[in-house]
Every structure is written in C-alpha cells, then in structure tokens.
Amino acid sequence: MNKKIILICTICCGLAISGCNKASKNDAKAEVANTPVVKRDTLVAAPTKNTPEQILAKPEVPILCYHRITEGHEGTYTVTPATFAAHMKILADSGYHSISPDQLYDYLVYNKNLPEKPFMITFDDSRVEHSEIAAPTMEKYGFRGVFFIMTITYNKKNYMTTDQIAQLAKNGHTVGMHSWDHTMVTKYKDSIDWQKEVVAPKAKLETIIGKPVEYWAYPNGVYNHEGAEELSKYFKISFILSSKRDSIQPLQTVHRIITTECSPEKLLKTMNQTFKMK
C-alpha cells in the first residue's frame, strides 16, 4: 500500500514539474513576442548640417534673375523674348544644367552632389510672360525655373492668374514668395507687417499650388540681419542680389544677378566673373 502511495506521489510531482517547465517556456515566448523590435533605420544618425562658415566657403552656383521679358520696354530689368531664348540656348549648348532650390539646399547644407555646370533661373514679380514665354522656352531645353510671386498681383492685367501659377508648379517648376506688395523686409516693423507680407500670403500661395512654399526672394534684393533671422523660420533659402551675405544666416542671403539685355556670350562671361564657382 505504501509503495502505491509513493508511486502516485512521484507521478504527480513529475506532472507538476513538466507543467511548470511548459509554462516557463510559454512565458519566455510571450516575453520575446512582446519585446519591441528596434528597426535598423532608427539607429541611423541624422545627417550633419554644415555650419554657416562651411556654407559660405562652398563654391557658388550661378543664379540668374529675370523680370520683364517683353518687346518695346527698355530698362535694366527687361530683356526681349528673343534675347531670353538666346540665353537659354547658349546655356544648353554650353552644357549647363538647371537645378531646383531643393537641390541647392541639399548641396549647401548636406554636401549633396550637383550636376555638371549647375545654374538656376529665377523670375521676380509674377509677370504673365513668365508663364507664357519663359516657361515654354525653358522647357524646350529641359530647364526648370523658380518663380517668385508678389501675391497682390493675382489675376491682374499683365500678371499671372492663379491657374497659371498652379500650372507652373504642376510642370515641375518651383513657386516661391516675393512678398505681398513688394515692401522691403527692412520696413517690416512688427508682427502685423510680417503677417501681411509673409505669413498670410505664404499660406494662400500654398493652397493655390498644393504644396509648401519654402523659398523667398527679397523685394529689391534688400535685407537686414533681423529680417534674415525672421525669414529663416519660414523659408529654407532666401535670395538677395549683389549685397554682402550675412555671416550668420548665409542660407537666407544667397546671391543672384539681374539678367539684362545682353548677348549670350556676355551672359556667360558675367556668370563666370560674378560667382565664386571654384
């Protein structure tokens, strides 16, 4: 009788131990299953941004600035359609490649590579010939431009309609800001001015083109340090003309040259003489 009792106890203990082992294994599996998996991507460090000093030391990309493209209107800011076409042709024939502001930003900030002989074509003031003459001419050579919009001009005579602006964005061009009414940044006194000239027009323009507006051209190319600091909150790059660049905000003071009624050959010479390309 005692032997039977001992045998039964032994069997029960064995079953209990076996059950505990199974439970431990199941608990271990559950713990492994519930442990969060760290993806390899999350371990990759964010790319390091260049310092202002490093940005200023980089070779400049030639950036052209056009205003009027029309016949019968002489002045520093005007070129004829024939001259504009000749400019685009010699640039294409000379092996230049147009780049976007996004490419320029990545080059300046992250040292990304650019195509051989890069340059940028920009347009100020929203004039209708930018859509009707400049864009088709550029597209013929595979170029894309940057159109800085003065938003007070929407749908007015001699200026682009909102549909034309939206179409430029759809066709691969970049649409940027040129203020509401061309008031210079140096005259913005308070948050009311910034709301009127930058914040509200930027939001409206973004609804028109259906994408963020990340680039700015200073009215008259004029800036001050305070304005550059404030604009850095809204734009990746802001473009000046021939003024000295800001040592603290080089991205908000990128050089351009006003393109005049000149021969194609002179244009190339001016580009080489003006920009620190090496």
Which sequence ranges carry the predicted segments?
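Acidic (Asp/Glu)-rich catalytic clusters
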Residues: 134-143, 160-176, 232
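Short beta-strand and adjacent tight-turn residues that come in two discontinuous sequence segments
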Residues: 148, 178, 240-241
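C-terminal active-site subregion of NodB/CE4 polysaccharide deacetylases
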Residues: 24-122, 127-129, 182, 186-278
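Positively charged n-region of N-terminal signal peptides that target proteins for export
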Residues: 1-5, 21-22
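C-terminal motif of bacterial Sec signal peptides marking the signal peptidase cleavage site
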Residues: 16-19
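Cell-envelope/glycan interface and biosynthesis
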Residues: 131-132, 143-150, 158
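Charged helix-capping and loop-helix junction motifs
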Residues: 158-165, 192-197
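Sec-dependent N-terminal signal peptides
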Residues: 5-14
